[in-house]
Structure formats: C-alpha cells, structure tokens
C-alpha cells in the first residue's frame, strides 16, 4: 500500500464504512465507492 493511500484511509473510513475491506486501496485509486 502506498503512503498516499495510507494517508487517505482514515478519511475514507470516516466518509463511509470499510465495506470493501482490503479492496479499499483500489477504490481510492479509482475514486469510486463500491458500497
């Protein structure tokens, strides 16, 4: 996991539940919400 994704993880968890699990990194990269 890149440092950029690691930095954005807390923001994503606050914005929406971690329903995608480890795939959250891919969501950050694509800018899409799989929820």
UniProtKB/Swiss-Prot annotation:
Covalent link location (Cyclopeptide (Phe-Pro)): 11-18
Post-translational events: Processed by the macrocyclase-peptidase enzyme POPB to yield a toxic cyclic octapeptide. POPB first removes 10 residues from the N-terminus. Conformational trapping of the remaining peptide forces the enzyme to release this intermediate rather than proceed to macrocyclization. The enzyme rebinds the remaining peptide in a different conformation and catalyzes macrocyclization of the N-terminal 8 residues.
Highest taxon above the source species: Eukaryota
Keyword Chloroplast belongs to the record: no
GO molecular function: toxin activity
Record keywords, A-Z: Toxin
Tissue specificity field: Expressed in basidiocarps.
Propeptide residue intervals: 1-10, 19-35
Function: Probable toxin that belongs to the MSDIN-like toxin family responsible for a large number of food poisoning cases and deaths.
Family according to the record: Belongs to the MSDIN fungal toxin family.
Protein name: MSDIN-like toxin proprotein 8
Organism from which the protein derives: Amanita exitialis
């Amino acid at each position: 996991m890149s440092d950029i994704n690691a930095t954005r993880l807390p923001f994503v968890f606050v914005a929406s539940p971690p329903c995608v699990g480890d795939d959250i990194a891919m969501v950050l990269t694509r800018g899409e919400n799989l929820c």
